[in-house]
Amino acid sequence: MHLFYTPDLELNKGEYYSLNKEESTHCIKVLRLREKDTICLTNGKGRFVFAEISDANLKSCSFLVNEVKDEYEKRNYCIHIAVAPTQNMNRMEWFVEKAVEMGVDKISFFVGEHSERTIIKRERIEKIMVSALKQSLKSYMPQLDEKANFYDLVKNAKKLHVKINYICL
């Protein structure tokens, strides 16, 4: 099954839709999908769409929606991970990828007293998140928070009045 990420996905059964040029090219040229092949789409907010390709065009691949599932694989709890960025950005990218694949709901980066890295390329992290979401066939994209101070992060977490587990490595 091939999953495509479309953040503005608000389709219903029986409707037609077209992928953007980048996703269409990937669908037809790279994955070599053809008409009548089944694909899945998600908006990253729980909507999961099963569709059949109706027009395999490199510039605008069209499909017909067969089934729509809202709140697909929704859980009744939330996993929020806060981490200080490491000096090696590859490790942070790997962490984000694995967190998305595992189904983390929220990722926060914080700066501590001895943090080695204070700059995070948000656009790069978001691309990695989209890639991991598609690879793991998840329907929920984690919320990526802005960088915060460690003490502010803990203070805000205590205001939520929920069970919190802290793990320091």
Predicted regions, residues:
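N-terminal positively charged helical leader segments and presequences
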Residues: 1-71, 123
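RNA substrate-binding interface of SAM-dependent RNA methyltransferases
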Residues: 72-167
